[in-house]
Amino acid sequence: MKPAFNVRQQSEIFIGPLADILSGVLPEGRVVVVSDSTIDRLYHSVLAQYDTVLIGLGESVKTMQTVEMIYRRFIELGVDRSTFVLAVGGGIVTDVAGFAASTYMRGVKFGFVSTTLLGQVDASVGGKNGVNVDGYK
């Protein structure tokens, strides 16, 4: 599959069915998916082949506590520096998963499948990810 867009030679953007995108662009080796219950319900048949970390829904999960939960799950799954972390979801999922992946073991490779319009123009191509602390963004 060829990218539909190339953002600053750093991010490739693919458009199409999730199964086609994943089969055409994921790196060789181990992939762990970070997502939420809505995406899991809608795409379980596509994502079932990967180890998955599910987070809650909404802005309230964009916290260090969620990042710590992701770290614990990564440890349970044996995620190491050769693992590719794929965040599938909207901006909250990509922000939290991107932050967790970039800080776990001093950073593991990660990518996004952004499922919302806002996530597609903000969190997935902004080059930075983060969580809220004590209600501050």
Give residue ranges: language-model regions.
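Buried hydrophobic packing segments
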Residues: 70, 97-101
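Acidic-aromatic/histidine active-site loop/patch
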Residues: 91
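Catalytic nucleophile loop
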Residues: 94
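Short, basic, helix/turn surface patches
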Residues: 83-88, 137
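ATP/NTP phosphate-donor binding region
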Residues: 1-84
